[in-house]
Amino acid sequence: MQINLAIIEHKEKKIVPVKAYMPFEMYGYKFAAHKAYSSDTWNVSEFSTGFSVERNCFTRAKALEKAKIRLETIGKENVLKAIEYAKELLKAA
């Protein structure tokens, strides 16, 4: 299982696949933990867009815990808006 992340590196946009772990669903979308592209920390992103929910955690468990809290705090409406915005950015890339 992998997530495709949109990365801007040296003013160049590219899509980078990263291995995803422990997926969970919320608000009709699937999220999972993955290692950060350029460091050894853990992030949580949405599958279809790579929309980052939580970043730079030292453990996978903490990244998942913090991501779920963040998603609940932000609320369904705002999460869905952010995912739609991420989809538009991917189309433009």
Please provide the spans of the model-predicted regions:
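Negatively charged, low-complexity tracts enriched in Asp/Glu with abundant Ser/Thr
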Residues: 1-27
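Generic structural motif
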Residues: 3, 31-33, 44
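Short linear motifs in intrinsically disordered
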Residues: 12-14, 30-37
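Short, surface-exposed beta-strand/loop "edge" segments at domain boundaries and coil↔beta transitions
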Residues: 12-16, 50-55
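A short, sequence-level motif marking secondary-structure junctions
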Residues: 21-23, 36-38, 57-62
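Short, solvent-exposed coil/turn segments at beta-strand boundaries
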Residues: 26-30, 47-49
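Short aromatic-glycine-(Arg/Gly/Cys) micro-motifs in beta-strand/loop hairpins
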Residues: 36-52
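Mixed-charge, Lys/Arg-enriched low-complexity segments
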Residues: 52-93
